[in-house]
């Protein structure tokens, strides 16, 4: 499954659209997600951001040995995207252990 977390952009063909971090995390917990593409700003920061998904994946890798999917960041928020990409690099490093 390919998961696309975004509140505004059109969903690419063949992707499953979610709007909130908890929806993405629920799908990740199934183990069926092969690729996930994350936006940061989702319209309501009190409801969470794409970075919350990065944090969940990182913790799941460390605590439970979760095998992360391929992770893409497509956020227009450049500083948040940089932070998310740094998180992806950390996840990749941890997953190789």
Describe each model-derived feature in a short phrase.
Residues 1-97:
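Catalytic phosphate/metal-binding cores of nucleic-acid and nucleotide-processing enzymes, i.e., regions
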């Amino acid at each position: 499954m390919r998961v696309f977390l975004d509140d505004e952009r059109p969903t690419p063909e063949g992707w499953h659209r979610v709007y909130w971090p908890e929806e993405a995390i629920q799908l990740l917990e199934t183990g069926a997600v092969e690729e996930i593409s994350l936006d940061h700003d989702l319209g309501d920061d009190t409801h969470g951001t794409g970075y919350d998904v990065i944090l969940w994946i990182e913790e799941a890798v460390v605590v439970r040995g979760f095998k992360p999917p391929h992770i893409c960041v497509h956020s227009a928020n450049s500083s948040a995207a940089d932070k998310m990409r740094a998180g992806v690099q950390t996840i990749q490093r941890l997953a190789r252990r």
